């Protein structure tokens, strides 16, 4: 009976998918189709908090600057900019050929050009408590901003912040039209008007989202051809990952992102190569991802083992990261054996962590000799990482540490971690912007959770001094030197145990051309075409 239900469910999803794709009369070879198994909650850039929101928002909106596939800052609506010698004043010259998507709210012409005052409005809105954007923190370093004229926008910082352009590349900082938001209010989330390569067509929430080509889009490719190439983007919302995978194998989705445990062995060999039976049908793309998976200690926990540097160091030494990646991830990812900062960013201390079971056992033995009881720790995770935590549980038992694994829903885990209710937790840190400061901020004492990302409540005066010096340092080489010192100091105290640095991995149909990957796993569709 259960098998019959699953078959009927899949038939229903297939019929739904077919009927949805037929409803838009566009050549199939010009429609890019993907599934989002998590629901999009908003198409408003002020709420571009998670990948499922950011991906469609990135097709609909533009900001002052953008990142290329190598994380280099590139022009977007700003065609050029200058930075004052003291690092406090950023002046942007705006393009004159950027227009909002068509809307009757613009009046007779149905559109208008973007001007500098639109960025003043967009930034005001991002900070507005009534909007309650989770991205308001992006402008914390900003003292003021103004429109000098229609095509010049100036930002004044409180203190120098060398990573500021990276912050501005986030979709939180996209430009939005005041006329449309004044009309729709909070319903702008489902009635977005932007400037991006695609415009909003239709959204049947939890079913399908359709975007269409913006024929007035301002960007061109390196050969001078207008972007985008595609006529439409069709996003399905099928929550079952197995059903998504089946549709992909049937050619009804153009790509899938990431690698789920339920089908990793079907697609990949144990060494991480694409299985030979799929080489004629699929392309695999993979590369560094600015995402560090780790376990964190809440250092104010009552458990004395958590407060013991010996126990934290023993855990860091007591499991084989290489085996973990091979066994659980088919070698997708890199063992995190050199600190918290992932591959692709400057600033790691470069000092490797050995796998040393004997030293780990000795550290546990010394802890017990000095009056401690056998360490018993509770590690909290969500269901997606249960296999990882059970691996750690087995390995650490071998060095004399007992781990109890508890599973919480993702939202509950996030809340409990932020409020200091978990003595030991599994977490991820995905870069918001491409600078090592983004990672090192997790150990700055003024960033204690729940108001900041220092979930461990690590506090060290020397670290804080180095962090503040780095923020005010405009010389890249000196700033990176401070980053290395901070990374080394944090590694020596072990407030967190880095597990692995993730990789972006995507599988695409052979007829998909122009798909690139980048270390922040942003989906860029303006340069994609289908044969």
Could you describe each region identified by the protein language model?
Residues 115-120, 154, 196-197, 227-232, ...:
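Alpha-helical secondary-structure segments
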Residues 186-189, 217-270, 402:
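Ligand-site clamp/hinge motif
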Residues 198, 334-367, 385-387:
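Structural transition elements
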Residues 131-178, 199-204:
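Surface-exposed binding/hinge segments that line
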Residues 35-85, 124, 131, 193:
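N-terminal lobe/hinge region of extracytoplasmic solute-binding protein
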């Amino acid at each position: 009976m259960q098998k019959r239900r699953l078959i009927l469910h899949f038939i229903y999803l297939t019929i739904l998918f077919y009927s949805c794709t037929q409803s838009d009369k566009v050549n199939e070879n010009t429609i890019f189709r993907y599934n989002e198994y998590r629901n999009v909650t908003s198409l408003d850039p002020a709420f571009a908090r998670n990948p499922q929101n950011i991906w469609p928002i990135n097709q609909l909106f533009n900001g002052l600057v953008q990142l290329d596939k190598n994380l280099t800052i590139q022009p977007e609506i700003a065609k050029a900019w200058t930075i004052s010698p003291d690092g406090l004043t950023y002046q942007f010259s705006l393009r004159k050929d950027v227009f909002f998507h068509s809307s009757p709210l613009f009046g007779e012409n149905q559109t208008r050009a973007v001007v500098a005052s639109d960025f003043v409005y967009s930034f005001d809105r991002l900070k507005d408590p009534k909007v309650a954007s989770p991205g308001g923190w992006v402008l914390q370093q900003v003292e003021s901003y103004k429109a000098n004229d229609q095509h010049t926008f100036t930002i004044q910082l409180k203190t120098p912040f060398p990573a500021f352009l990276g912050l501005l590349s986030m979709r939180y900082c996209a430009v939005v039209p005041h006329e449309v938001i004044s009309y729709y209010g909070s319903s702008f989330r489902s009635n977005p008007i932007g400037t991006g390569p695609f415009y909003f067509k239709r959204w049947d929430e939890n079913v399908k989202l359709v975007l269409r080509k913006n024929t007035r889009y301002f960007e061109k490719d390196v050969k001078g051809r207008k972007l985008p190439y595609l006529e439409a983007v069709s996003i399905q919302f099928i929550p079952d990952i197995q059903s998504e995978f089946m549709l992909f194998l049937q050619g009804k989705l153009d790509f899938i992102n990431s690698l789920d445990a339920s089908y990793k062995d079907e697609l990949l060999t144990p060494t991480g190569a694409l299985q030979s039976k799929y080489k004629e049908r699929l392309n695999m793309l993979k590369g560094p991802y600015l995402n560090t998976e780790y376990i964190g200690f809440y250092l104010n926990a009552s458990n004395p083992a958590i407060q013991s540097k010996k126990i934290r160091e023993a855990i860091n030494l007591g499991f084989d990261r290489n085996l973990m990646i091979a066994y659980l991830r088919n070698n997708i990812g890199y063992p995190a054996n050199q600190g918290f900062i992932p591959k692709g960013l400057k600033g790691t201390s470069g000092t490797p962590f050995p796998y040393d079971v004997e030293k780990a056992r000795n550290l546990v033995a010394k802890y017990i000799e000095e009056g401690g009881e056998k360490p018993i720790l509770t590690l909290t995770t969500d269901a997606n990482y249960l296999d990882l935590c059970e691996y750690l549980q087995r390995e650490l038992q071998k060095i004399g540490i007992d781990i109890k694994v508890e599973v919480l829903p993702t939202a509950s885990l996030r809340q409990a971690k932020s409020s200091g209710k978990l003595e030991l937790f599994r977490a991820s840190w995905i870069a918001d912007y491409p600078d090592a400061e983004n990672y090192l901020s997790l150990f700055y004492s003024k960033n204690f959770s729940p108001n900041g990302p220092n979930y461990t409540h690590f506090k060290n005066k020397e670290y804080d001094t180095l962090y503040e010096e780095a923020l005010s340092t405009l010389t890249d080489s000196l700033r990176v030197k401070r980053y290395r010192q901070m990374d080394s100091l944090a590694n020596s105290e072990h407030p967190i145990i880095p597990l692995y640095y993730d990789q972006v991995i995507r599988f695409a149909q052979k007829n998909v051309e122009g798909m690139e990957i980048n270390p922040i796993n942003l989906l860029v569709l303006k340069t994609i075409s289908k044969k």
